[in-house]
Amino acid sequence: MHRYRTHTCGDLREAQADETTRLSGWCHRIRDHGGVLFIDLRDHYGITQCVVDPDSKAFPLAEKLRSEWVVRIDGLVRKRPSGTENPEMPTGFIEIYVTEIEVLGAAAELPMPVFGDIDYPEDIRLKYRFLDLRREKLHKNIMLRGQVIDSLRRRMKEQGFFEFQTPILTASSPEGARDFLVPSRIHAGKFYALPQAPQQYKQLLMMAGFDRYFQIAPCFRDEDPRADRLPGEFYQLDVEMSFITQEDVFAAMEPVIRGAFEEFGNGQPVTQTFPRIPYAEAMLKYGSDKPDLRNPLVIADVTDLFARDDVSFNAFKNVIKKGGVVRAIPATGAASQPRSFFDKLNDWAKSEGAAGLGYVIFEGSDEAPVGKGPIAKFLPAEVQAAIVTRADLKAGDAVFFACDIEEKAAKLAGAARLRIGHELGLSKTGVFELCWIVDFPMYEWNEDDKTVDFSHNPFSMPQGGLEALQTQDPLTIKAFQYDIACNGYEIASGGIRNHRPEAMVKAFEIAGYGEETVVERFGGMYRAFQYGAPPHGGMAAGVDRIIMLLAGVQNLREISLFPMNQKAEDLLMGAPSEATTKQLRELHIRLNLPEPK
């Protein structure tokens, strides 16, 4: 017999009744029923009920056992007595009649229980993550993570991609976030950087003659944490392809992403053909470039209606005269809601920094809905009818209005759309709604610095190429850039690359970077462009966010092995920690710490 086990705690069934077995695992739960001890023994594979009678020679030791002790149990497999079976457990029709117990590892008093679903403070969970990971839900999430990554790898290889590993120690580059820097001992005063993404390396692979690249890539960004972004590091399915168009990327990647959601989505419907939504349309209709399409509400622009001479609502007209816009957010069936519903939404809008949300309630008949509410009196019947048509309203609906400069109005309208959909129970559940967002702007205006900045990835190909860069207003240029959104989350982003050196230099020049800056910051890739660069493009999908959606959780810590807390601290390992004087001396570093506040 094996030293520790002949079966796992998830193996045994009625077919093994009357066999001798040996199991090893953790004491998940111990119960005393009329002097008979029941031990639920748990390992990675499942739980098996073990029974210790008072006349068993193992009973004296069994009485001393406590939760999470690691034990080896020998015994006889037998069917559970009629009426005591547990069909919820794979092993629920058998139990082990215990003949011998060996303690393999005692456990100190637990800072948090493993049994049960009681939530504990995050600092306790992270400090004792090894205990937290024993809990069933988190344990399953981590196993799901491995399975999803295996599936993504398999699907990428089926699409003809080859897996590569790019360097972890690299040069610092301005990719939108702070770098994690690594000081060089050999080269005093110089630093490596951990890659924010393998962007340059994967493009260099295409220039090196490889055709279809992917990797499950660790990425490092020194940025503030939030629920859908872990501090420090994250993983992405990184992809690049040569001699392709945007449509080729879509054709290759849509089956991979869709397939993963179908395989691990517990039967929830998944969008079969991802619709393509231009960025400008997404911002207008949904107030977001990562729209949640489970919500049926569609925002409409009604600026021209409020700008009419016969409309006397000056609060909006004054904003419109300064270049503002008015967005209408429909609220299907909201006419029957109490006044508190509308007041609560108005208070919420004010808490978001807005002046509020104007609204109109439509009553009467579908043929002739009549508007009521605080601003209805300022709107002639003709304007009300136009709003009904444009916002796709009917009697019994209401409509809210967001008025501000376009960027702020879109953001408020988008947030209001989500809130209204949730409050009214309009959004679908149990479904994965995916879409492509396309035609992103190449550049955006930085109001603080009064400069033109890259809108997203600086390496994207402008639509129209070099000619567009030379002749168009930069703020009108669109890029061959695209995202995948799912249920309100951005889960992938990519683009066709600007592979011509003269176009790349011009693109950076518009954003305020001279050729010398391009050479300094992207020297390796810029040199490679001089020696025959193929047309290429790709994308990166957020592995962590995909798994978070599949697991049905709201926080990335629930699908990550050893995450940091909100302060970017690893409470288990004690990182970050102080370096020794010897370590600092070897790295030629002297500390200059800020004064304590």
Curated annotation (Swiss-Prot):
This is Aspartate--tRNA(Asp/Asn) ligase. GO terms for biological process: aspartyl-tRNA aminoacylation. The keyword ATP-binding applies. HAMAP family: Asp_tRNA_synth_type1. It is an enzyme of class 6 (ligase). It holds the Pfam family tRNA_anti-codon. One of its GO terms (molecular function) is aspartate-tRNA(Asn) ligase activity. Its EC number is 6.1.1.23. It comes from the Bacteria. GO terms for cellular component: cytoplasm. It catalyses: tRNA(Asx) + L-aspartate + ATP = L-aspartyl-tRNA(Asx) + AMP + diphosphate. ATP binds at R221, D222, E223, E490, G542, V543, D544, R545. The record marks H33, G83 as: Important for tRNA non-discrimination. It is found in: Cytoplasm. It comes from Beijerinckia indica subsp. indica (strain ATCC 9039 / DSM 1715 / NCIMB 8712). Aspartyl-tRNA synthetase with relaxed tRNA specificity since it is able to aspartylate not only its cognate tRNA(Asp) but also tRNA(Asn). Reaction proceeds in two steps: L-aspartate is first activated by ATP to form Asp-AMP and then transferred to the acceptor end of tRNA(Asp/Asn). Keywords: Aminoacyl-tRNA synthetase, ATP-binding, Cytoplasm, Ligase, Nucleotide-binding, Protein biosynthesis. L-aspartate binds at E175, R221, H456, R497. Homodimer. Residues 199-202 are annotated as: Aspartate. PANTHER family: ASPARTATE--TRNA LIGASE, MITOCHONDRIAL, ASPARTYL/LYSYL-TRNA SYNTHETASE. SUPFAM superfamilies: Class II aaRS and biotin synthetases (SSF55681), GAD domain-like (SSF55261), Nucleic acid-binding proteins (SSF50249). Belongs to the class-II aminoacyl-tRNA synthetase family. Type 1 subfamily. Its main location: cytoplasm. InterPro entries: Aa-tRNA-synt_II, aa-tRNA-synth_II, aa-tRNA-synth_II/BPL/LPL, Asp-tRNA-ligase_1, Asp-tRNA-ligase_1_N, Asp/Asn-tRNA-synth_IIb, AspRS_core, GAD-like_sf.
